[in-house]
UniProtKB/Swiss-Prot annotation:
NCBIfam families according to UniProt: glgA, PRK00654.1-2
Family, per entry: Belongs to the glycosyltransferase 1 family. Bacterial/plant glycogen synthase subfamily.
EC assignment: 2.4.1.21
Protein name: Glycogen synthase
Coiled coil: none
GO terms of biological process kind: glycogen biosynthetic process
Length: 505
């Protein structure tokens, strides 16, 4: 089976969130199952550097409204920069890049400039990537390889299924099956309808029975409407987005497509996130050597300017600082956290008001609250190794990876019962302690008092070190790798090909 992944980011080259981790790990896990999975990325400078002496395969025409020359399709393995190491793209995964400097040779992050302002031509940039993927699917890569399935991810590649569908309607050509994964329904890629022709979209597509959404072109909706199969990143989130509370106006479409929608949990790169071999933490350990975490805790306190002799757990946050992530609730609960003898370490950036509130908390509580306003991959590893409790009180969370990293490292996750958090963390109760399934602390509904009560339960268990270590060992023993998820995707691909074949007869 031949599968082409197409996405806007991939760790370690470009990362703004968990999408990059998934795109880096899942193709390699699928190749372990004998699936010829390959990856297409925008030709950002780090991607082109990783390709090194890439093979130019073919020229690609521009979109009608692009205003720039067409791009080139390059191929390689993504390891030519010599940076293969923890987390680098598996060399077994063939990598394609769309070399289009006018769109992708920029500073800043993939979607915005250095000041955080979205690039005004984002729709054309990522539509160009989607068009390149569709062309590979319809015509091949120039070396005789053509995918049977194209797996697109989030709004940036939502036009891939649409381009495939329209090309097949226009020419009668056989097209590959399209699979579209929703990593976060909140980000929808809404653009003005005046761009319809510029994006090479037919007039009839601008309809409620198409990609129109409240008077705009919905790039995410295009993927939801035109893809053959839909997935999202946890079973619970797949159910949540079919209701108005978390459907962001698309719940009706998702209910209509419920038979084509699957929730498949993300996994963790077990090579990258392994406390027994992690080069980024002060001391390596496993579930039989939990005392080695003390060195990581001491180093973590030093990094965040925290006191060395607390009377309670060291709580931590590794997150975008946003309302969705419940950071405001953490700050509201801070007086109770401190009254429990706890400390708080926060790593992240995001909403400026929340950043300022966190900075004020650090100023008001020196030695008890620490803040690093950055995205720092190495420091995130050290937090997982040194924290007692990882706080993830999200209002919604499609899957979440940070709580799975916490399980792996023995930092007990304290999470809201939403999305993938509900699917990956088992609450500490008498029954779960008795049967060995307890792995953390889960609260509902999302709100201040439920969060505080969960903090109180965590602090109480922390004062019972034997039980605490038991739950840590439970957490570290949970299978959070990609193998099971990859098997689910492989089954989905086979079913999608079978269904499409039957429909075409």
């Amino acid at each position: 089976m031949r599968v082409l992944f197409v996405a806007s980011e991939c760790f370690p080259y470009v990362k703004t969130g968990g999408l990059a981790d998934v795109v880096a790990a899942l193709p390699a896990a699928l190749r372990e199952l004998g699936i010829d999975a390959r990856l297409l990325l925008p030709g950002y400078p780090p991607v082109l550097a990783a390709l090194g002496e890439a093979r130019p395969l073919r020229d690609l025409p521009p979109l009608p409204g692009a205003g720039v020359p067409g791009g080139r399709l390059l191929a390689g393995t993504g390891t030519a920069d010599g940076a293969r190491g923890p987390g680098a793209l598996d060399p077994a995964v063939p990598l394609y890049a769309l070399d289009l400097p006018a769109f992708f040779g920029r500073g800043g992050n993939p979607y915005s400039d250095a000041d955080g302002t979205d690039w005004p031509d984002n729709a054309l940039r990522f539509a160009s990537l989607s068009a390149a993927a569709a062309r590979i699917g319809l015509e091949g890569d120039g070396e005789g390889w053509r995918p049977e399935i194209i797996h697109a991810h989030d709004w940036q590649t939502g036009l891939v299924p649409a381009y495939l569908r329209f090309a097949a309607e226009r020419t009668g050509a056989k097209r590959p099956v399209s699979v579209f994964t929703i990593h976060n329904l909140a980000f929808q890629g809404l653009v003005p309808p005046a761009l319809l022709a510029d994006l090479d979209l037919p007039p009839h597509s601008f309809s409620i029975h198409g990609l129109e959404f409240h008077g705009k072109i919905g790039l995410l909706k295009a993927g939801l409407y035109y893809a053959d199969k839909l997935t999202t990143v946890s079973p619970t989130y797949a159910q949540e987005i079919q209701g108005p509370a978390m459907g962001f106006g698309l719940d009706g479409l998702l209910r209509a497509r419920a038979r084509d929608l699957s929730g498949i949990l993300n996994g963790v790169d077990l090579g990258l996130w392994n406390p027994a071999s992690d080069p980024l933490i002060p001391a390596r350990y496993d579930a039989t050597l939990l005392e080695a975490r003390q060195a990581a805790k001491a180093e973590l306190r030093h990094a965040f300017g925290l006191g060395s002799v607390p009377d309670g757990p060291l709580f931590a946050v590794v997150s975008r600082l946003t309302h969705q992530k419940g950071i405001d609730l953490v700050l509201e609960a801070l007086p109770r956290l401190l009254a429990l003898g706890g400390q708080l370490a926060i790593l992240g950036t995001g909403d400026k008001v929340l950043e300022q509130a966190a900075a004020a908390a650090m100023h008001d509580h020196p030695g008890r609250v620490g803040l690093v306003r950055a995205y720092d991959e190495a420091l995130s590893h050290r937090i997982q190794a040194g924290a007692d409790v990882l706080l993830v009180p999200s209002r919604f969370e499609p899957c979440g990876l940070t709580q799975m990293y916490a399980l792996r490292y023995g930092a007990l996750p304290l999470v809201s019962r939403v999305g993938g958090l509900a699917d990956t963390v088992t609450d500490v109760t008498e029954s779960s302690l008795a049967d060995g399934s307890a792995t953390g602390f889960v609260f509902e509904p999302v709100g201040l008092m439920p969060l505080i009560h969960a903090m109180e339960r965590a602090a109480a268990l922390w004062r019972r070190p034997d039980l605490w270590r038991t739950v840590q060992r439970n957490a570290m023993g949970r299978d959070v790798g990609w193998a099971a998820s990859a098997r689910h995707y492989a089954d989905l691909y086979r079913q999608a090909v079978m269904d499409t074949t039957l429909l075409s007869k």
